[in-house]
Curated annotation (Swiss-Prot):
Protein family: Belongs to the long (4 C-C) scorpion toxin superfamily. Sodium channel inhibitor family. Alpha subfamily.
Tissue: Expressed by the venom gland.
Short name of any one Pfam family annotated for the protein: Toxin_3
One GO process term, biological-process aspect: defense response
Compartments where found: Secreted
Primary location recorded for the protein, binned into one broad class: secreted
Assigned GO CC terms: extracellular region
UniProt source species: Androctonus crassicauda
Primary role: Alpha toxins bind voltage-independently at site-3 of sodium channels (Nav) and inhibit the inactivation of the activated channels, thereby blocking neuronal transmission. Electrophysiological studies of this were performed using sodium-channels expressed in F11 cell culture, by patch-clamp recordings. Affinity of this toxin toward sodium channels in F11 cell line is in the order of 1 uM concentration.
Domain characteristics, as noted in the entry: Has the structural arrangement of an alpha-helix connected to antiparallel beta-sheets by disulfide bonds (CS-alpha/beta).
Alphabetical UniProt keywords: Disulfide bond, Ion channel impairing toxin, Neurotoxin, Secreted, Toxin, Voltage-gated sodium channel impairing toxin
Domain LCN-type CS-alpha/beta: 2-63
Protein's name according to its UniProt entry: Sodium channel alpha-toxin Acra4
Domain of life (superkingdom): Eukaryota
């Protein structure tokens, strides 16, 4: 398990909607909160996510189209 900014399959963060605590728990984490991530803005930070749930990799950009 690890802590981090939860992301979708394109390495894009979730922007605090839906509420982070529910999103993180739904994905197997212990808890979640809204935090500021440069340059993404407000994003969901999760504690104790399972290893199979993707978290933000700063070496790759978000690839939304």
């Amino acid at each position: 398990v690890r802590d981090g900014y939860i992301v979708d399959d394109k390495n894009c963060v979730y922007h605090c909607i839906p509420p982070c605590d529910g999103l993180c728990k739904k994905n197997g984490g212990k808890s979640g909160s809204c935090s500021f991530l440069v340059p993404s803005g407000l994003a969901c930070w999760c504690k104790a996510l399972p290893d199979n749930v993707p978290i933000k990799d700063p070496s790759y950009k978000c690839h939304k189209r």
